[in-house]
Amino acid sequence: METDVTSDTVEVLPQHKFDLRSLEAYLNQHLPGFGSDSRAVLTVTQYRSGQSNPTFFLQKGSQAYVLRKKPPGSLLPKAHKIDREFKIQKALFSIGFPVAKPLLYCRDASVIGTEFYVMEHVQGRIFRDFSIPGVSSAERAAIYVSVAETLAWLHSLDIRSLKLDKYGTGVGYCKRQVSTWTKQYQASAHQSIPAMDQLSTWLMKNLPDSDSEECLVHGDFKLDNIVFHPKECRVIAVLDWELSTFGHPLTDLAHLSLFYYWPRTLPMINRGSHIPENTGIPLMEELISIYCHRRGIDPNLPNWNFFMALSFFKLAGISQGVYRRYLMGNNSSEDSFLTANTVQPLAETGLQLSKRTLRTTPPQADAKSQLFAQSRRGQEVLTRVKQFMKQHVFPAEKEVAEYYAQSGNSAEKWGHPLVIEKLKEMAKAEGLWNLFLPAVSGLSQVDYALIAEETGKCFFAPDVFNCQAPDTGNMEVLHLYGSEQQKKQWLEPLLRGDITSVFCMTEPNVSSSDATNIECTIQRDGGGYIVNGKKWWSSGAGNPKCKIAIVLGRTESPSASRHRQHSMILVPMDTPGVELIRPLSVFGYMDNMHGGHWEVHFNHVRVPASNLILGEGRGFEISQGRLGPGRIHHCMRTVGLAERILQIMCDRAVQREAFKKKLYEHEVVAHWIAKSRIAIEEIRLLTLKAAHSIDTLGSASARKEIAMIKVAAPKAVCKIADWAIQVHGGAGVSQDYPLANMYAIIRTLRLADGPDEVHLSAIAKMELQDQARRLTARM
């Protein structure tokens, strides 16, 4: 059915061979025009793609046809009803809907062994790959628009006018689908797949309230079941109506949208969330919008996760049935055996989607992101993060605060309350996990910067999305510089959230603002290294899940420069000689939530040589790669925290009175509010510019911008927090409000990753160098 039929057909499979002379004799007698050229020879080839009902291309002289038949052998009940295909195509063709013209139906199984029907061959283009290679972005977009509009047309048909009596029940379609595909799967299963059983149970318990909606549904509506005009982006035939009936229209729309969530473990296509920008392929929300506009319905579709989960469940059931026919020897395609490995990942994807809240309208771009544009995926993920924060994270703040208030004197204070662990599982199921790492999330630094701002509004939110420091920086180190063994042993469990980590750099006995002062040693000893030294401000070391430390220490080489004297090495926390000495308070706060900030001693700690990261003398090189994106994350979380502080300040200013006036009516308070808004906008833009520079130029070329935000953001937000405390009076420094804790968190950022003064000196040096280059260029 493509322009080049030979590329899509093969010799008839042995199990599907039939009597050609019998077929030819029957068609000569019953199909008008078939025998017009008595000298022409009938040739028959089989389509590769027919996995359910075998499909054949018939050629006789200038005449071309397509034959569909039932597969031979024992069949599942109510499956392979090709008479229904013929009936629906005949009805649709009569009203001008794009289908191949049905020509005849044969119920006499003696002709070729089973019932069959013949239709016209439609000459056109069929795209087997959802990315539609070989066409322009504009044409690709037009093709998808045509697909969505054709589906909307189908669902808008008046089913009564089609005169398809008893073609389908309609009402209760979703429930019947779950029941039918559960039975079909169970009848053909060759092994136990728990995800299929769990998904079946979930679907039956979460049927949509709108299950009474009915229209004509295709049942397998997807790109490779559509024939397009040879030159135009126009649908000229929709194929394969085997599963058509009266049912819920969103089942078709969800089936069309499968590729957006396709499991990466399956080789057919890549996961749609990583569809490249500017390819013309619409976002799922855009595709839905086109469909809904054509039908005149609201694009905010309820229960979308149900319909997506049902589509994956159904496809998993179909795949299981195809494999069963392969085992029985009556498969319709030579590669049917491959479907055995698709059932489980399809079911697991459906189960994951069942736990997610899926939006069906395009995200509205925030005005603050327009100067440094987000990707389409960045907009979509940010919208979902905001929704998740509103629905789940902010409502949990009180419970989390009470947990740490009550566990202050127990060992549990360094761990997480159950509610955070539940939120983490929910975020992972929603796909809102490891968003900070571009290679995993597909997000740019600008994309993630805006997400970091949102998570900065709640002190435990980064942990919910597995985007907390210092783990983000440590995971970046392992991703960029770790060996395959190091990634497998430590990066993978960190990415899963099974463990946490600590970064050990700062030392109590030296001025660590000059990192070359570091005294901790990493000495080669036979087949390993021995680590000796004292570290402090090792954040997260007290977390019960903290299993690995990245330690910066000296591996002196007399011939190397002062910045090639240090290395980084992995030290498991349970290695003999690793000792947690004491937690360090910050303005009296222990920062239990993040596992505290600890003094850690390494006393003759021996680790294998394979634990060294990248090589001896590469420590500062790794640090620069680690700290660039990390400072973006810190500063944008600070922007988010500033927004929260300003909100608290404004609430207080509106509610309280002093000297017979609301606080905001006092000019000094009004000015604090105004200056706060100005400062927030300034540091947001400066940080987004730094993120944009990393995206476009790389971390090395963005050093000045990164240093500037590291100075500007914490300093500005400290001032905003101070104003907010003033507005609250004594309450501002009490436990009744979070402002004192917020101030403590922000104030430490003026020291973390280097004090302001170090960054200011670096900025001045880079500025003078830039000015000198400009002067030289002018001369």
From Swiss-Prot:
It is found in: Peroxisome; Mitochondrion membrane. Pfam families: Acyl-CoA_dh_1, Acyl-CoA_dh_M, Acyl-CoA_dh_N, APH. It is an enzyme of class 1 (oxidoreductase). It catalyses: a 2,3-saturated acyl-CoA + oxidized [electron-transfer flavoprotein] + H(+) = a (2E)-enoyl-CoA + reduced [electron-transfer flavoprotein]; docosanoyl-CoA + oxidized [electron-transfer flavoprotein] + H(+) = (2E)-docosenoyl-CoA + reduced [electron-transfer flavoprotein]; tetracosanoyl-CoA + oxidized [electron-transfer flavoprotein] + H(+) = (2E)-tetracosenoyl-CoA + reduced [electron-transfer flavoprotein]; eicosanoyl-CoA + oxidized [electron-transfer flavoprotein] + H(+) = (2E)-eicosenoyl-CoA + reduced [electron-transfer flavoprotein]. FAD binds at residues 503-513, 537-539, 656, 726-730, 755-757. Substrate binds at S513, G628, P629, G630, R631, G754. Pathway: Lipid metabolism; fatty acid beta-oxidation. InterPro entries: ACAD10_11_N, Acyl-CoA_dehydrogenase, Acyl-CoA_Oxase/DH_mid-dom, Acyl-CoA_Oxase/DH_mid-dom_sf, AcylCo_DH-like_C, AcylCo_DH/oxidase_C, AcylCoA_DH/ox_N, AcylCoA_DH/ox_N_sf. Acyl-CoA dehydrogenase, that exhibits maximal activity towards saturated C22-CoA. Probably participates in beta-oxydation and energy production but could also play a role in the metabolism of specific fatty acids to control fatty acids composition of cellular lipids in brain. This is Acyl-CoA dehydrogenase family member 11. It comes from Mus musculus. The lineage of its organism: Eukaryota, Metazoa, Chordata, Craniata, Vertebrata.
